Amino acid sequence: YSFTNYDIFHAPEFVGLDNYVKLFTKDREFWNSMAVTLKYTFITVPGKVVLALIIAVILNRNLKGINFIRTVYYIPSLLSGSVAVAILWKVLFMNDGFINSLLGLVHIGPVKWLGTPDMAVITICMLEIWQFGSSMVLFLSALKQVPQSLYEAARIDGASKPRMFFKITLP
């Protein structure tokens, strides 16, 4: 139907590429939505991946109580669609909410988190990045598959921790 002029009252009328010409040349809302989508994508995808990888590397250690901490980091992914989380975000992002109260402690004025289109996109990106738990679990399961003998051999060869991360862990 994209090649037709169509509504529910009349039969479709073939218009060729006219709809696409209008979309790409005259429709400002289309280009605005593309810009917002690109901004959202370029913020959330790297943000979520980097945060999930960092947390997975930290949680890959065999420490006492680490399973509890892993669970705590995964919970936001499970709760993402609940009403309780919606209320929590509302409390956090209100003009006199928790985050603005913390900003006030360091003498930063209140931020209107949803008051402008740019801040709304950033706020929505933060909400998406907050759900990094599923990505973290995937990274953590992959990290658990790396044989410890590779790290032992690298230590014997004198490799530094950053070198082991970039040559063994990350690949």
Give residue ranges: language-model regions.
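A structural signal for multi-pass alpha-helical bundles of membrane permease subunits
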Residues: 1-171
